[in-house]
Amino acid sequence: MATVPTALAGRHFLKELDFTEEEFRGLIELAAELKAAKRAGTETRYLQGRNIALIFEKTSTRTRCAFEVAAADQGASTTYLDPAGSQIGHKESVKDTARVLGRMFDGIEYRGDSQTKVEELAAFAGVPVYNGLTDDWHPTQMLADVLTMTEHSDRPLREITFAYLGDARFNMGNSYLVTGALLGMDVRIVAPKSYWPAQEVVDRAHRLAAASGARITLTEDVAEGVRGAGFVVTDVWVSMGEPKEVWAERIKALAPYAVTMDVLRATGNPDVRFLHCLPAFHDLGTKVGQEIFEAHGLDSLEVTDEVFESAHSVVFDEAENRLHTIKAVLVATLA
């Protein structure tokens, strides 16, 4: 039977900044226990009779599946609302939607552009609200990534070094920087300066680091940024919903920050691991990949296929861990 942290009962999960280091670590530990129980066939169903609404204004594979399977494993039911299936923000205000769904459901997940929208849902729903991704933060992904790091390193979190390469201005860059700072890790943001997180986010990270002992580096130098790293991380250069017109500019700016085998060798760590939240443009196996090849002559973007398919890559362990960590959030807040 897992040890459920009662301090998180009834809490929202909106961004990493809302949690203490102890609370965040507690969710990682709970996820590891739930994962082990699922594999052993000894999982306890803590959420029998619960109902969870899943609002997706942005499409998803991993996040939707993780919430649905996590809920089902725990005995809860889910209702999926896509943009065509709900009136949120169109015919009905976020505030009113929150108050309606809060009367019917025990928890609400939201995935879309606006952090303001998920915060407003939380303010008026009266039940726990979960951020499945916004433009600013991706907290459920951070739980999965940190769990994956603990599984693939024999070091404690405070001794783990990871480097994030690429566009760090939005949710993934913000979340990696703040999460690493919160947990006392050695976190490096490696990108052109114009692609660094906003100064407000950097300042918040430095304040967290002062308390946790984290080491924070922001650099344009790839060799400096990855030296000694145990994990190299990246994300897509063009985010969901962005127009194709931005591709050329992004590719020109970020091409030196693509994760190649040379980048992994530059860590000096033969056991370095590669993480990516997915989907990844590492080959020509997608429609978007084909369009990029036709327009720019590139067979990969943020990571080469050689790295993606190598023994260094743990991206599918990371993807699986979305399930176990989201389950931990549901159990901790609703059990």
From Swiss-Prot:
Keyword Transferase: yes
The keyword Metal-binding is assigned to this record: no
Pathway named in the protein's UniProt entry: Amino-acid biosynthesis; L-arginine biosynthesis; L-arginine from L-ornithine and carbamoyl phosphate: step 1/3
Top-tier EC class: transferase
Reaction(s) the record says it catalyses: carbamoyl phosphate + L-ornithine = L-citrulline + phosphate + H(+)
Pfam families: OTCace, OTCace_N
Subcellular location(s) per record: Cytoplasm
Disulfide-linked positions: none
EC numbers on record: 2.1.3.3
Keyword annotations of the record: Amino-acid biosynthesis, Arginine biosynthesis, Cytoplasm, Transferase
Binding site for L-ornithine: N171, D235, S239, M240
GO annotations of cellular component type: cytoplasm
Family note: Belongs to the aspartate/ornithine carbamoyltransferase superfamily. OTCase family.
Protein's name according to its UniProt entry: Ornithine carbamoyltransferase
Organism in which the protein naturally occurs: Streptomyces coelicolor (strain ATCC BAA-471 / A3(2) / M145)
